[in-house]
From Swiss-Prot:
Stated role: Acts in the assembly and extrusion of the bacteriophage by forming a channel across the host outer membrane. This channel is just large enough to allow a newly synthesized phage particle to pass through. Extrusion is a process of concomitant assembly and secretion and takes place at specific assembly sites where host inner and outer membranes are in close contacts.
Membrane topology summary: Single-pass type I membrane protein
Gene that specifies this protein: IV
InterPro entries: Bact_Secretion_Sys_Channel, GspD-like_N0, GspD/PilQ, NolW-like, NolW-like_sf, T2SS/T3SS_dom, T2SS_GspD_CS
Similarity section: Belongs to the inovirus G4P protein family.
PANTHER family from the UniProt entry: PROBABLE GENERAL SECRETION PATHWAY PROTEIN D, SECRETIN GSPD-RELATED
Transmembrane regions: 317-337
Gene Ontology biological process terms, A to Z: protein secretion; viral extrusion
Provenance organism: Enterobacteria phage M13 (Bacteriophage M13)
Localization: Host membrane
Annotated GO CC locations: host cell membrane; membrane
Protein name, UniProt field: Virion export protein
Pfam families, A to Z: Secretin, Secretin_N, type_II_gspD_N0
Length: 426
């Protein structure tokens, strides 16, 4: 008898707890699934308008029956929907001019973040004394602030908390004690700031060794500083001097240098990349070929197989540039730059493809609008060419009289000009 009483008591406790709390966890679930859940839990008939589409993300471990309707309406309004009428209620897109909306939810004393904060999408869900609220992020991506906000919340409380982002509306959803949420808008105002963009203009070119380029009209009046503190009045002297392959210049050196290179038959422009990227974000551009390289081979003789095969791996071969700029408050730009100029070799000595590689990777500090010169990567090419009179050059001994062979050595040096300009945020 006592055992039966204990079982009944446990059963009543389970039923009681189930009737007073509802658990819901939805991550990017269809809105109609959320409506179906509410209809089953509340027993209320709901009509969904055909234009109601989208997804919702909701986490709550304690929604009491008396708060279920308000909780449901809060989530709808956070996603720009609302309920109209009653028995049955109709869910449709939010229209502030519609007078048939149900009564407003109980007002809360949430602190707003500027003028575009959570009231348009904020809602409260009791969860171990935590409050859940949304915050509108105006200048950066909400997901980029998740780790920063988590650090702020965890450094101010030892209680459990959670921070999520809604990418479509650029919202942060924060579940934390109410006193933490009251201070969060002030903290967000220090990190939700407009981000500058940086325009990277490049010029990748090569010059045959020993040829002097006339950059006098392109950079004759542009004064620069070469590595080591040596001043120069002309870009020409930098390119022509021994080891002079590094310099920083002011003015429009880049644009005028393109014109100078086009008029010289011994120079070759490989690429003129233009990259616009946010400060603190990586940008890259490349052009070339996707070349297959043999990484393994299985033949019938060596492996005793009926179907010999070989494995390949494709790699990009061509011209590429990647940058990672950061705009500083004083107008300086810290720039990580990597530039590559790869090409396929014409050599037939190897059984597979041979590539020629030339690359530069460095980190520099430039002023806004300055142009950086990098270079000194020399490539040596040795070519041999046989020619002769058809048929006669193949005759033994005397065939040498009707044939000739020429050898040539070519040297070319790769240079990279990079100009960085800050595009201020509006």
């Amino acid at each position: 008898m006592k055992l039966l009483n204990v079982i009944n008591f446990v059963f009543l406790m389970f039923v009681s707890s189930s009737s007073f709390a509802q658990v819901i966890e939805m991550n990017n679930s269809p809105l109609r699934d959320f409506v179906t859940w509410y209809s089953k839990q509340s027993g209320e008939s709901v009509i969904v308008s055909p234009d109601v589409k989208g997804t919702v993300t909701v986490y709550s471990s304690d929604v009491k029956p008396e708060n279920l309707r308000n909780f449901f309406i809060s989530v709808l309004r956070a996603n720009n929907f609302d309920m109209v009428g009653s028995i049955p209620s109709i869910i449709q897109k939010y229209n502030p001019n519609n007078q048939d909306y149900i009564d407003e939810l109980p007002s809360s004393d949430n602190q707003e973040y500027d003028d575009n904060s959570a009231p348009s999408g904020g809602f409260f869900v009791p969860q171990n004394d935590n409050v859940t609220q949304t915050f509108k992020i105006n200048n950066v991506r909400a997901k980029d602030l998740i780790r920063v906000v988590e650090l702020f919340v965890k450094s101010n409380t030892s209680k459990s908390s959670n921070v999520l982002s809604i990418d479509g509306s650029n919202l942060l959803v924060v579940s934390a004690p109410k006193d933490i949420l009251d201070n969060l808008p002030q903290f967000l105002s220090t990190v939700d700031l407009p981000t500058d963009q940086i325009l990277i203009e490049g010029l990748i070119f090569e010059v045959q060794q020993g040829d002097a380029l006339d950059f006098s009209f392109a950079a004759g009046s542009q004064r620069g500083t070469v590595a080591g503190g040596v001043n120069t009045d002309r870009l020409t002297s930098v390119l022509s001097s021994a080891g002079g392959s590094f310099g920083i210049f002011n003015g429009d050196v880049l644009g005028l240098s393109v014109r100078a290179l086009k008029t010289n038959s011994h120079s070759k422009i490989l690429s003129v990349p233009r990259i616009l990227t946010l400060s603190g974000q990586k940008g890259s551009i490349s052009v070339g070929q996707n070349v297959p390289f043999i990484t393994g081979r299985v033949t019938g003789e060596s492996a005793n197989v009926n179907n010999p095969f070989q494995t390949i791996e494709r790699q990009n071969v061509g011209i590429s540039m990647s940058v990672f700029p950061v705009a500083m408050a004083g107008g300086n730009i810290v720039l990580d730059i990597t530039s590559k100029a790869d090409s396929l070799s014409s050599s037939t000595q190897a059984s597979d493809v041979i590539t020629n590689q030339r690359s530069i990777a460095t980190t520099v500090n430039l002023r806004d609008g300055q142009t950086l010169l990098l270079g000194g990567l020399t490539d040596y090419k040795n070519t041999s060419q046989d020619s002769g009179v058809p048929f006669l050059s193949k005759i033994p001994l005397i065939g040498l009289l009707f044939s000739s062979r020429s050898d040539s050595n070519e040297e070319s040096t790769l240079y990279v000009l990079v100009k960085a300009t800050i595009v201020r945020a509006l």
